[in-house]
Amino acid sequence: MKMTAQEYARRVRRTGPHSPLLADIAWAFCVGGGICLLGEVLRQRFLAAGIETELAGTLTSCSLIALSAVLTTLGWYQKLAARAGAGSLVPITGFANAVVSAAIEFKAEGRVLGTGAKMFTIAGPVIVYGTLAAAVYGAVLWLKGLLPV
């Protein structure tokens, strides 16, 4: 018996596990907000220590990336992400987790073809599309005369 796509979708909806959507959204919001709150606390601490605003922002990002890498290495970030969903994936910590996870997973294949190459299967598209988006945005601003040459 061949099943159509609509029949399959109906069967999945009927038999698949149902998650509490509002609770999942609220939890993702709280986790993402908590990560951002931690970032703001770190930034305020850097500013209170007399560090310039721009450098404080850079140090905050680096601190969150390092913390995410450590938590990923210990296996704790995956547990958080399993429950928090996009709340833990959208901030910069989610990107760091994705890169470090790939590096850990393919470590046995060697440093170059394992860790080095597989890290960028995740990071590569983000870097490419991020750079492309920045170039397009810069071109639009330049064409509008908002960006000095």
For each feature predicted by the language model, list its residue ranges.
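Individual transmembrane alpha-helices with interfacial aromatic-anchor signatures
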Residues: G116-L132
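Hydrophobic alpha-helical transmembrane segments
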Residues: I25-C30, T58-C62
